[in-house]
UniProtKB/Swiss-Prot annotation:
InterPro entries, alphabetized: Adenylat/UMP-CMP_kin, Adenylat_kinase_CS, P-loop_NTPase
UniProt source species: Synechococcus sp. (strain CC9902)
PROSITE patterns registered for this protein in UniProt: ADENYLATE_KINASE (PS00113)
Name the record gives this protein: Adenylate kinase
Keywords recorded for this protein, A-Z: ATP-binding, Cytoplasm, Kinase, Nucleotide biosynthesis, Nucleotide-binding, Transferase
Gene: adk
Binding residues for AMP: T33, R38, E59, L60, V61, G86, F87, P88, R89, Q93, R130, R141
Length: 183
């Protein structure tokens, strides 16, 4: 199974849930930028306060901040497999990440795109109960995804790394689909 992965997809598509399942069953490190940022917010650090204000507006945290977090996490890994969830979100971030991964001799092996309709995404996100999940913020996040993140689809498709997976159905069904395409 490929073990250096990137998950893409709109907010609410199940990236975090599926990433955790894939990592647990395959002994991979789950690098979730969303979780890293939320832990900074919970810690109340200056960085966390800055990130919280941006996230509460449904906007993206700066490239420099997220790349620094990812770099420190990647350097701490000793050759184990990893799954990057929530970064990169823009083509410039992907272009900044690539030389870092090449320097670490850990290039991405596959990019899994979880695809799901907006109506299902909105329903899922409203049911999560996160402070930053209200309908206006969710619609803004979907718009930001379309503007900033969706161009990554063609970026990774052109590199021959993109694998699309339908993200409807039960958690188990989606995990099974992902495992099948990664073998």
């Amino acid at each position: 199974m490929k073990n250096r992965l990137l998950f893409l997809g709109p907010p609410g598509a199940g990236k975090g849930t599926q990433a955790a399942r894939i990592c647990d069953s395959n002994g991979m490190k789950h690098l979730s930028t969303g979780d890293l940022l939320r832990s900074e917010v919970a810690a109340g650090s200056e960085l966390g306060k800055e990130a919280e204000a941006v996230m509460n507006r449904g906007e993206l945290v700066s490239d420099q901040l997220v790349l620094a977090i990812v770099e420190s996490q990647m350097k701490a890994l000793s050759g184990e497999g990893w799954l990057l969830d929530g970064f990169p979100r823009t083509v410039p971030q992907a272009e900044a990440l690539e030389p870092l991964l090449n320097e670490l001799k850990q290039p991405i092996e596959a990019v899994v795109l979880l695809e799901l309709d907006d109506a299902v995404l909105i329903t899922r996100m409203l049911s999560r109960g996160r402070a930053d999940d209200n309908e206006d913020v969710i619609r803004n996040r979907l718009e930001v995804y379309r503007d900033k993140t969706a161009p990554l689809i063609s970026y990774y498709q052109n590199k021959g790394l993109l694998i699309s997976v339908p993200a409807q159905g039960s958690v188990e069904e989606i995990t099974e689909r992902i495992c099948k395409v990664l073998d």
